[in-house]
A protein has these predicted regions:
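C-terminal-biased regions
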Residues: 1-30, 44-134
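Short helix-adjacent coil turns
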Residues: 31, 35-42
């Protein structure tokens, strides 16, 4: 265990990613309501915000991956090492925090993917219903 490696950068990167993924889920919830109301203009506005949020998430994910690779390098581990291997090399008192943050990133990632698919299905249904009534 190497306590000289700063784990704050990794924690900050994980928190940033969580915040942005949470923001996307909020936007997707709004979009779901908008789709059920069949509010085309509001949906277009939300689509742009969702695209922007996805770009932010991508940058945050890259930042987290960079922080993990950087920590692995400082700990003299391979760059492609798994997060749990890096966590084990940090002081024991920080393990629960890092494990919880990584777990929450995974949970929100799965939820985000589910919501994106759900909303895509609603959009397709909405477009089909709109085109068949015209």
């Amino acid at each position: 265990m190497d306590s000289n490696v700063n784990w704050d950068q990794l924690v900050d990167a994980l928190r940033d990613e969580l915040q942005e993924k949470g923001g996307l889920i909020r936007l997707l919830n709004q979009q779901t309501e908008t789709l059920y109301r069949r509010d085309i203009i509001e949906n277009e506005r939300l689509e742009e915000q969702i695209r922007t949020q996805l770009r932010l998430i991508s940058r945050c994910t890259q930042g987290r991956e960079f922080a993990l690779r950087q920590a692995a390098a400082k700990l003299e581990l391979n760059e492609d090492v798994q997060s749990h291997d890096v966590i084990r090399r940090f002081p024991e008192y920080v393990h629960p925090l890092l494990e919880a943050l990584f777990s929450e990133v995974d949970r929100l990632s799965n939820r985000m993917e589910e919501r994106l698919k759900q909303n895509q299905g609603l959009k397709e249904r909405f477009i089909f219903e709109t085109s068949s009534t015209v």
